Amino acid sequence: MMSQQEEMIEHVEGAFPVAIPLENPPERTPTLLKQRVLNQLCVQFGIAEAEVLLPGPNDFADRPPYGFVAINRQMCLSGAIPPFNEFLRQILLRLTISPFQLHPNGYAILMGLCVLFRRTLDRLPSFEEICYLCTFAKNKDHPSIVLVRGARNRKLILDLPESAHGFLNQYFYIRCPAEFYADWRVGSEIFFLFFL
């Protein structure tokens, strides 16, 4: 039996089948974010404090409370500010992962491509264009996290950071729209076609 969130995702046009939830990912760690820092992030990025929760010592990013999704500080610093734009929502749905599972460098690259396409073509890039311009990969240290890099010989944006230290333990929960995967996912079969 599917949850209400999974039923809504399945009905979204162009979405892939619901992916399998991850059990005990190796990246599971409690947050080190403090309430004072969370309040500062809310003010800095225009996030309503009523929409966020600071996880407790026994809470983890891969299993947020119902109606919430885990967000890390570096995502906001990269320009991916909740509730996200439609472009990011569709990319995450197509990849069948939760927002936290996309490495913060991926948000910097994707948001950079959004700005570039908007300014030059007056539109957002399609998923197919993103797959042509970027490579998606996982590494052995963090197999639940998806890395994004500019494809070799097709980098439109240069000198973006390739790493973001400490993002796994600086997260909070934010109320999420129904079309997000909240729990961490393995990813659908189509997802792995784009991985190197």
Residue spans of the language-model regions?
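Residue-register detector that marks a fixed positional context within folded domains
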Residues: 1-196
